[in-house]
Amino acid sequence: MKMKFGIISIFPEMFKAINDFGVTARAIKDSKVSISCFNPRDYTTDRHATVDDTSFGGGAGMVMKYQPLSAAIEDAKNTLGCGTKVVYLSPQGSIFNHRKAQELLQNDSLILLCGRYEGVDERLIQDYVDEEISVGDFVLSGGELPAMLVMDSLIRLLPEVLGNKESVVEDSFYDGLLDYPHYTKPAVLPNGNAVPDVLLSGNHKEIAKWRRKQKLIRTYERRKDLIECLCLSAKDKQILDDYKIDKVSTKGEE
């Protein structure tokens, strides 16, 4: 499976980070991913290559123009396929998470529209955008960083991109839970802080049990909202019940 990305951005140079480093660069080198950038400035019709203008009705900030953006999207569709889904990275979109990543992965190609300034002409959204996605409730200068975040998340989920399949399966959110704690050498730090004994035991069954317990506890402590969305097994529920009882009794002893 090869996934194709079309990027609509006035700063295509930013995507060198995806092309040149880490897992994503390796996926591109191995022809599992292709990235094509379409700069709206290349589709303007004036000598100043204007991509933005003032907002009707007044107000601060500039708005990205319909014409150069629509032309860039049309060219991207001609390159990637006329049915390619267009995703606009926008703070008004639905929140991006692991479930959304898996959903987007059903597409062989995606066009990611990166806005700037106050956003894009609303008519462009009406005519071209299939979905708006947000990476969180905060404001950024443009859609390039969110687009790279989405791309990285999708690329690492593609078959055979990661060398070890377990790396994907054991990631946070893969099963709806946060990841368990990780440790590496040395086994004991100079201050005496040591790796849990079970991880040094060589008993893979006990290690798996410990890791499952830690995933459950960590998610319960840090993201109760995730726990509430899961259908936990009776064994998982018992682990959490025991943890809550131990926590209460420990607190009572203090």
Swiss-Prot record:
It comes from Francisella tularensis subsp. tularensis (strain SCHU S4 / Schu 4). GO terms for cellular component: cytosol. GO terms for molecular function: tRNA (guanine(37)-N1)-methyltransferase activity. Transmembrane segments: none annotated. Belongs to the RNA methyltransferase TrmD family. Its EC number is 2.1.1.228. Homodimer. Keywords: Cytoplasm, Methyltransferase, S-adenosyl-L-methionine, Transferase, tRNA processing. It comes from the Bacteria. This is tRNA (guanine-N(1)-)-methyltransferase. It catalyses: guanosine(37) in tRNA + S-adenosyl-L-methionine = N(1)-methylguanosine(37) in tRNA + S-adenosyl-L-homocysteine + H(+). The lineage of its organism: Bacteria, Pseudomonadati, Pseudomonadota, Gammaproteobacteria, Thiotrichales. The keyword tRNA processing applies. NCBIfam families: PRK00026.1, trmD. GO terms for biological process: tRNA N1-guanine methylation. Specifically methylates guanosine-37 in various tRNAs.
